[in-house]
Amino acid sequence: MITSPTNLNSLPIPPGDFGLPWLGETLNFLNDGDFGKKRQQQFGPIFKTRLFGKNVIFISGALANRFLFTKEQETFQATWPLSTRILLGPNALATQMGEIHRSRRKILYQAFLPRTLDSYLPKMDGIVQGYLEQWGKANEVIWYPQLRRMTFDVAATLFMGEKVSQNPQLFPWFETYIQGLFSLPIPLPNTLFGKSQRARALLLAELEKIIKARQQQPPSEEDALGILLAARDDNNQPLSLPELKDQILLLLFAGHETLTSALSSFCLLLGQHSDIRERVRQEQNKLQLSQELTAETLKKMPYLDQVLQEVLRLIPPVGGGFRELIQDCQFQGFHFPKGWLVSYQISQTHADPDLYPDPEKFDPERFTPDGSATHNPPFAHVPFGGGLRECLGKEFARLEMKLFATRLIQQFDWTLLPGQNLELVVTPSPRPKDNLRVKLHSLM
């Protein structure tokens, strides 16, 4: 809601603590998974702080999400911490604004059309099956780093081309690059940010070689790079080389980091709930799955859909996001000043007991047709964000999650090894502190 400047000035700014000069509470934010929860308990559901040198107001809940997501470009515009903006690059969809963002989103969406996703399925399935075969031979697995390799292999194959995924340098460079995305922007050789900048330069140089090689080959739209090379903007011009590099790097990040977190959470939660694991298996047994999985077969698993929705609710791969206020406004009796940032909290929304009774419980029954979650208001379940900036690849993520879950449940049972720390590290995406050590039991 927008009110007159006079009325706004009479409203209080939300309570909170700015912390240290410039730095504010950045270190606590990066290192404490309960940062938002603790401050909500202290100050209430809307509070202020300072992060990365910026004043920030935290909000959560379905109503707050609706307020933010429906006022994009009117009251809010997308923004990222400085380190993230620099490392994603000026030509990545995530950092583009206005008409350029609209135009590029339309182009990139071609890589995630239903027919395109269907065409990805055989290669995705082959990669997943290959990793499952490796893990079965190993018996005991430290799962999280293995999941990272698998999702990167899928992303590199489907976004850049099959041969590229065999380049042994890409994965370690990419791991270093990701570690600095949400860091303090200090460009020194031994800082996370400095190391990430160097890794980004190496990745961009390699991407340039790949793109130039593809430009010499016959056109092919079998992967995202081929689609982007064939695309034309609103002026009927091809995308520039700098933009192609930034967009592909963004796709690799988006199709790898958060997906790994989601798959890890699935493995963790179903490892802790054998009854739910068995019910998923029973649903599969009724379908008599063949060697080749199709998109139509995957659509016939409503209980698995519920399980995945609950995984994304309980441990969302992205804890929240940022918007910048481009004009003063008010929300729930507080003044939100122009130039400040607003952070919407996915984790806190998903833990709201008014939306999800007993929110700490893993309960897929919430998402049955008559379950409590199906009666929630819009923007109560937002694992992929919302509005104009909703995750473009959300259906790609759902497809990979569902395919992986299906093949895993079909071929293996698993137990979590004792003596490990399952507490979640939250930056940049949630993962168990000891990387999820498991013992696999083959069912084939």
Swiss-Prot record:
Source taxon at top rank: Bacteria
SUPFAM superfamilies on file: Cytochrome P450
Presence of the UniProt keyword Oxidoreductase in the record: yes
Keyword Protein biosynthesis in annotation: no
Binding positions for heme per the UniProt entry: 391
PROSITE patterns membership: CYTOCHROME_P450 (PS00086)
Pfam family, one: p450
UniProt EC number: 1.14.-.-
Keywords: Heme, Iron, Metal-binding, Monooxygenase, Oxidoreductase
InterPro entries: Cyt_P450 (IPR001128), Cyt_P450_CS (IPR017972), Cyt_P450_E_grp-I (IPR002401), Cyt_P450_sf (IPR036396)
GO molecular function, one term: oxidoreductase activity, acting on paired donors, with incorporation or reduction of molecular oxygen
Cofactor: heme
Family: Belongs to the cytochrome P450 family.
Name under which the protein is recorded: Putative cytochrome P450 120
Organism, scientific name: Synechocystis sp. (strain ATCC 27184 / PCC 6803 / Kazusa)
Gene: cyp120
